Curated annotation (Swiss-Prot):
Signal peptide extent: none
Gene Ontology biological process terms from the UniProt entry: mismatch repair; mitotic recombination
Gene, per the UniProt record: msh-2
Name under which the protein is recorded: DNA mismatch repair protein msh-2
Annotated SUPFAM superfamilies: DNA repair protein MutS, domain III, P-loop containing nucleoside triphosphate hydrolases
Protein location: Nucleus
UniProt: ATP binding residues: 659-666
Assembly and interaction partners: Heterodimer of msh2 and msh6.
Main location as per UniProt: nucleus
Amino acid sequence: MSSRPELKVDDEHGFIRFYKSLPQLGEEAIRIFDRGDWYTAHGDDATFIARTVYKTTSVIRQLGRSDHTGLPSVTMTVTVFRQFLREALFKLGKRIEIWASPSGRMNWKVVKQASPGNLQDVEDELGGQFEGAPVILAVKISAKASEARTVGVCFADASVRELGVSEFLDNDLYSNFEALLIQLGVKECIVTQDKGEKEKDPELAKLRQIIDNCGVAIAERSAGEFGTKDIEQDLSRLLKDERAASLLPQTDLKLAMGSASALIKYLGILHDPSNFGQYQLYQHDLAQFMKLDAAALKALNLMPGARDGAKNMSLYGLLNHCKTPVGSRLLSQWLKQPLMNAEEIEKRQQLVEAFANDTELRQSMQEEHLRSIPDLYRLSKRFQRGKATLEDVVRAYQVVIRLPGFIGTLEGVMDEAYRDPLDEVYTNKLRELSDSLVKLQEMVETTVDLDALDNHEFIIKPEFDDSLRIIRKKLDRLRTDMDNEFAEAAEDLGQEREKKIFLENHKVHGWCMRLTRTEAGCIRNNSRYLECSTQKNGVYFTTKTLQALRREFDQLSQNYNRTQSSLVNEVVGVAASYCPVLERLAAVLAHLDVIVSFAHCSVHAPISYVRPKIHPRGTGRTVLTEARHPCMEVQDDVTFITNDVTLTREDSSFLIITGPNMGGKSTYIRQIGVIALMAQIGCFVPCSSAELTIFDSILARVGASDSQLKGVSTFMAEMLETANILKSATAESLIIIDELGRGTSTYDGFGLAWAISEHIVKEIGCFALFATHFHELTALADQYPNVKNLHVTAHISGTDTDTDVITDEDEKAKKKREVTLLYKVEPGICDQSFGIHVAELVRFPDKVVRMAKRKADELEDFTSKHEEENGGGLGVQYSKQDVEEGSALLKDVLVKWKDEVKSGRMSKEEMVARLKELVQKDERLLGNPFFKSVQAL
């Protein structure tokens, strides 16, 4: 960071005037000025970059004379600029405009634009390694009071030239829209602008909150851009099919078409003629994949978060042993789109099993074949946009010549059970694609000089053209002369060639010699040798003869390149026609890469994963034996305690888990969600045996950490998440609730937790897991047979009862209650609270712990005394039978009393006296424990 470029601008005042005349971009956008081999930013953007990249404002320089009229500016090297670009687009969700002045002074214009969902212009600067495909989505809603809320979306991953549309009904919390954002892994969302401060649309505000919760960048566009007037004409220019766009069924989705119109304008697709006739339009069906809400995404740790240190902290990091960038991106997509069709899941499982059982097949795929595959989607994109070079053609060729290796390895599978599935999904497709690409291979072999690749030279074969052949001969002769000069120098200096002294083609100095730094002394004070530069790897130097040869060589190389450039253009043009085939190949290899990665994880886990049995949708039960949390078991210093899980419709569809803090409740309920998701993406699962039903959604309510930053209290965030769950859950959902009702008073919190639990059990009837500290909630199991109580166990040694006999303070300390958490989940209720134990674990001051214990004991004494005074606490002093019997006896007395007093002749006092008399006469009623507790006369 120390070697920042110096701020040198030709016409300072002219640039300041120009910069200040530019319109404001708003907080979300940043302007960068490209000045050749360095970059600058100015004004507020300079301050932002100084704080974000350099972490100090001392790097800001003033352009112009004084602070008053000057312009705060900051400079960046190419490396720092690229680092900032990644940070701004991937983490901060900013839009970037890059300005350049191609034809000299003060002729600035925007040459590149980028945003989190549109990285096309800056792919080269970013280096092409992204976790997921940058998907950008536009959304338009219709929420009239008389109609149901309808949401229309259009989305695109610009790198694969596909437009997806979808239109669906939604509830007032937009749960379906949230599920869609997560399914697609959207990075940026285009919404309509509010008309003004006075006319704020509450529906739009809700939409923004959801987009924000999912960590998606927001771009605003005027309502006019969502108009559908020109959309049919635009689509007919973009789509591959020649048929009129108006005949497509998707054009009836008016809201989605409005979104498509805004998206096409935002991406500027129509400005690039290479896009015409290249796009495909498809309709996305929300119901074909399991739905996940934003809370589930966090609760299950699907994707790496900003705070995740180790790779294995997220499921994506754990499962990502992909060897290709396309494989990693497909894995990211699969994790957000778990399948709902048992047949499709089993197909994937069968393929995973093939690679898991055959170690040789798996290792040769990973180490020999997949490792050498470049990012074919990005490569294809370079061809389509006319940016490809001969090097890109060679990279495509190198993939083609490796295909027979893939096919041969797959054909070597002997087991009949796996042979057919592998043939269907991979071998046959690869054979067909390999045949289609044979012509590309032949063309490269006849036109490109493959021998020159060893020197990292990408040139056309000299035999292909007479003038090239003549220049090549001269170049070869010069190369020989250089080698001779090198040999002479090595002998003269007494250095061993290729060990101490080297001949290299340096990117700045051209052909020159290099000595290791330890041997560099031998050329000092020797007039024959001219030193070029000293770098980490040694000292570069040359001789007058070598310098002359190098100049001639460079001159001839330029001639060669000029002569071959038209031939190169032809070769690149022919290779570009193979883009659709390369994209199909990319899809097959990405699928293969993810499946092999699943197999690798399943075999290399601390305890191997097993293939789960999947029941058809709407049937069966979920039974997991010795289940483990996949991310937790691979952490260092963790010995994971396994637990069994049984979820059946009639007996245990709602599990209430009580127990001490840090006892493993959260891990237990989350691991069930993670295992269900792993099973539905076709992966093996961390159990000793497993059978699962298919869930249509996983909905979670877990800790809300950053809600205050968005102006929402923790309790409010909790209620919003829960409302979302209750509105979007169906009978086939899996609900995970980790604590509920903690952010309010104990009584309100318990009331809400009870009511919500009862609603899930009675009205929704889905599978649910509820970890709670409200021990009273366990009474639900007495009312509903499908509610089961579980608790996490703890071993308690020592007791407090006999401490008053012990006089020695040390002995007292030894005798105090020791709690050992066992992390085992057992049936039944946990009858104690362990909050103070956790305080002891984290070394709270002794004084605070003692005070807490005293207060807790006082409260317990007060409660028990209060209950005794009232004839025993509810649910403690009498049985269910007592309640039924007491109620019946009381009813008889009241009916008898009612018959006597209905004539209306008695006064109020006489009526009360008569009722007391009847009660006193009934000995059975007076002896009933339940009646004693409710007696109020």
